[in-house]
Amino acid sequence: MPFTLHLRSRLPSAIRSLILQKKPNIRNTSSMAGELRPASLVVLPRSLAPAFERFCQVNTGPLPLLGQSEPEKWMLPPQGAISETRMGHPQFWKYEFGACTGSLASLEQYSEQLKDMVAFFLGCSFSLEEALEKAGLPRRDPAGHSQTTVPCVTHAGFCCPLVVTMRPIPKDKLEGLVRACCSLGGEQGQPVHMGDPELLGIKELSKPAYGDAMVCPPGEVPVFWPSPLTSLGAVSSCETPLAFASIPGCTVMTDLKDAKAPPGCLTPERIPEVHHISQDPLHYSIASVSASQKIRELESMIGIDPGNRGIGHLLCKDELLKASLSLSHARSVLITTGFPTHFNHEPPEETDGPPGAVALVAFLQALEKEVAIIVDQRAWNLHQKIVEDAVEQGVLKTQIPILTYQGGSVEAAQAFLCKNGDPQTPRFDHLVAIERAGRAADGNYYNARKMNIKHLVDPIDDLFLAAKKIPGISSTGVGDGGNELGMGKVKEAVRRHIRHGDVIACDVEADFAVIAGVSNWGGYALACALYILYSCAVHSQYLRKAVGPSRAPGDQAWTQALPSVIKEEKMLGILVQHKVRSGVSGIVGMEVDGLPFHNTHAEMIQKLVDVTTAQV
């Protein structure tokens, strides 16, 4: 019968016993239960040991390092007896200068070279089958392992793409499975992606790099976990004259513990919630229960109705959470703002919108995302000066591109949004509208008093309409009255419950509709929600696909980029200098929507930041 080598405290000599035997004492044990856990071996020259150890430490998801042998103990006599085995099965792949040159049943012929080599003991994935069972799902045959285009963090010559394994999961079982995986496997059990394989750079699941073909039945969601077979690419990348690695599917059993082993009972900071954030391409994201609850608290805070407009009827649960999750995955964001409600004044813009947009820009900059603002062409000079002043006064870190769009056709919108007009390569991943005039069903644009301001508004709505048909571009609308771009998602409620709603309701829908008593508050809340997500260990690991080091919660650059009473007072002061008026009263002064900055807005900003940065 096949034999599984149990490696306990005598790891070095046991490895020697393992690799010098001509008997195949390794077998696939990924679904075995008990205290022992499966692991694979990588054998490298001693000179590369420190670099490979560090490479594993900065890519712990796919490469959980359990231990390594001490070179001087390689030649200790083997301890214990090896039980009867089948003969002749290969156990190792041999690598020479980065190329796999053959498979070996033993390393006996390399005993001299092994004196100056180190064996690394890498934890294999926890038992997915056990997690499936715990979540009430049937066990499935082990699937293949696919190479992604996600790069591991490079260190001293070791560089390779992440390799993943997949299981198809019914939609209604996703959260239960993810929680079971995290409970059983801790950080190692958390998936790195749920949704379209192409978001990982996997073109065909049916053609894995290792193992059997992977198939995802219709109606189920492909869920991916990091694979320890990532180590094979690392071994190849270093191009050392001689190295060895366990053949895929072959493991040894050990009682060595991962330093990041599951705690047994998950705390709210580690219990994951699963959220659907995109249908085309299919994409789910996760955040911890505690992070999600914080963001829900922000949503509740900004949802008050100081103007008694009836916005409570427009509120949709978790829109702020889903919008911020989607934004966190975006690489490039385009933000639009500007509502020329004061059509008899110059400039006609109001003080609601630009501060919220700039606050979001500031935080996206801190996250090192590409970000640009798009405005009406007639208001380009105004917004250019506002941004320049914001940089000069420290509200923004650096200048950002300010774009315009004149429209004309569906083709023009697609050409603007995509590189060379190709919908396969969008320039932006996410569009955000904050207090931006939105097109009504009759094609006009109305302020809250039902005055048509179409002559002052460029057709930026067309970009949101085009984005609906371009896979990979999501959108968010932030509004406080229902006539703002993106509020088409709640247009029926606007028509029923908002004054003049039957006329002014925006007809253009965003994927996510964030409703706030003042739209600026929605911009502040999006920035705060991103801070919460990036400080969440569960979401952060998912976002970086379990490769690379994590950043400490409350990173100083992120904290400094959050909205603050001081920065927002400066921002409103900049608008006042440029004669921008309050939306309700028309006053040029320190107020937004007829509400004074000191007391009302300052208090809201401080409350949002306090909730955001509070320790759980």
Curated annotation (Swiss-Prot):
<feature type="transit peptide" description="Mitochondrion">
    <location>
        <begin position="1"/>
        <end position="28"/>
    </location>
</feature>
<keyword id="KW-0496">Mitochondrion</keyword>
<dbReference type="GO" id="GO:0047820">
    <property type="term" value="F:D-glutamate cyclase activity"/>
</dbReference>
<dbReference type="GO" id="GO:0006536">
    <property type="term" value="P:glutamate metabolic process"/>
</dbReference>
<comment type="similarity">
    <text>Belongs to the D-glutamate cyclase family.</text>
</comment>
<dbReference type="InterPro" id="IPR017135">
    <property type="entry name" value="D-Glu_cyclase_mito"/>
</dbReference>
<dbReference type="Pfam" id="PF14336">
    <property type="entry name" value="GLUCM-like_C"/>
</dbReference>
<dbReference type="Pfam" id="PF07286">
    <property type="entry name" value="D-Glu_cyclase"/>
</dbReference>
<dbReference type="GO" id="GO:0005739">
    <property type="term" value="C:mitochondrion"/>
</dbReference>
<dbReference type="InterPro" id="IPR009906">
    <property type="entry name" value="D-Glu_cyclase"/>
</dbReference>
<comment type="function">
    <text>D-glutamate cyclase that converts D-glutamate to 5-oxo-D-proline.</text>
</comment>
<protein>
    <recommendedName>
        <fullName>D-glutamate cyclase, mitochondrial</fullName>
        <ecNumber>4.2.1.48</ecNumber>
    </recommendedName>
</protein>
<dbReference type="GO" id="GO:0005759">
    <property type="term" value="C:mitochondrial matrix"/>
</dbReference>
<dbReference type="InterPro" id="IPR038021">
    <property type="entry name" value="Putative_hydro-lyase"/>
</dbReference>
<keyword id="KW-0809">Transit peptide</keyword>
<keyword id="KW-0456">Lyase</keyword>
<dbReference type="InterPro" id="IPR025504">
    <property type="entry name" value="GLUCM_C"/>
</dbReference>
